Swiss-Prot record:
Obligatory cofactor(s): heme
GO annotation, biological process: secondary metabolic process; terpenoid biosynthetic process
Name of the protein in its database record: Cytochrome P450 monooxygenase ntnM
Entry's family note: Belongs to the cytochrome P450 family.
Amino acid sequence: MFGDFVEKLPQKLPQKLDIPLIINVILSIAAIALIRALAISILRQYRLRKLPLVNGVGVFESSQKAKQNFLFNAEGLLENGFTKSTKAFRMATDDSEVLILSPDYIDEIRNDKRLSLTHALAEDFLGHIPAFVNFSPQKGLNDMAGDILQKKLTQSLDLSTEAALALQEQWTDNKEWHALNAKTTMVEIVARISSRVFLGLELCRNPAWLRITADYTVNVFFGVMALKKWPKYLHPFVWRFVPEVRTVRDQIQEAVNLIQPVVEKRTAEGKSPSSRKTYSDTIQWANELANGRPYDPALLQLGFSLAAIHTTSDLLSQILYNICAYPEYIDPLREEIVTVLKEHGMTKAGLFKMKLMDSIMKESQRLKPGAMLMMRRMVLEDITLSNGVFLPRGVQIGIPTRSHFDPSFYTDPERFDGYRYVKMDDDPQREKSRHFVSTSPEHLAFGHGKHACPGRFFASQEIKIALCHILMKYEFKLADGSKPTVMKMGWVLSSDPMVQLMVRKREGVDENLLYK
């Protein structure tokens, strides 16, 4: 009705312009529009406020109390929230309120186009700030990266040699027991393996690039946390002066200085048929898939580092901790590796056949996913769910990983069972969801639905190749006194960065199997 009035307004104006009248009409329209917007906003907030709030603060309490409570007790707050409402509740975080939904809504929201992961990440990681431009939904880097991950990345499996070289450097050929930091070495190894595919031989062993790709994610995290200490309205003005944010900007420039010459060299080669070469890495694939879309090659590579290095190395570390805690799985794993590699070699088909390894990976991820809240989304349009729960535009939502410990899905869910998913081979209803790369309502570690992690297939191959080399070449165990503890910060769950492993090189092993 209001739109019709605006469309017909020119017909109702007098032929002879009356400037004061026109000004009054314009001001009236603006006032009506403002009142309408305020009324809608108030109504949205009213409907949202009907849901219980966990971690709120009193009138005379500082918001810092809620932030600290969230950062150090998010898990307890989630459990408390579900005692107040089994459907949905609000929770104050270090940045804003998030609407927590019951896992019952997983299938209802998983493919809803009105819910955006990229916009949620942009809000969480301040994508409007130039230093954190990788999180800006307007840059299109997420679409470009998604295309590469889905269409190209798993076409290459030239990773076994790189895994061998990286592991030899980190764990050495020492046949005597020696101590090392598990997670630090996993970050270095995963960075090398990933960079082999991301950047090819030109840069994958470059110490400067490996330092950037290992540090960038951590620096972004600390940069965002440092800037969030300032009021939001000051972010556009103070970000240049925050030391942690400047570090991120400096690293972006370092990445540009390393990657741009490679891109320019390849562009020059492409202009001459005699010097044209074929490359199999993300620099080449991005050029092929761009289809006219502008993108920054350095930012794209840093985006891959954000998505791949620390998430994969964190999970690989946790898997090693679990194998150390349950050493009875080591011999069956080695037997599986030898059997599969003899028949299939280090191929995609071979890696897919490693069912016990796949099960141990998935079980490790079930018990310790990367975060306790998954399926993060920003609501782009007002939505009313099937049972009446209202999701107002502009609010973030998420679903906890409670289903990972639901006894209706898992027998004895608190216990680590390396064969848990192998046993599902005999269950036709769950056979498809048993694979490490499969997503389902009962296993949300990679998300579920439209925004499920597109890099999970590459991560699976990468982890399996690394485990094959580690298990076949080394004996390893927890150092005396090392007791891995899951580190919790806000939603994030991290494997223990302080764990020491004792390792030594095995003797009498046919390592040629690893390169078939």
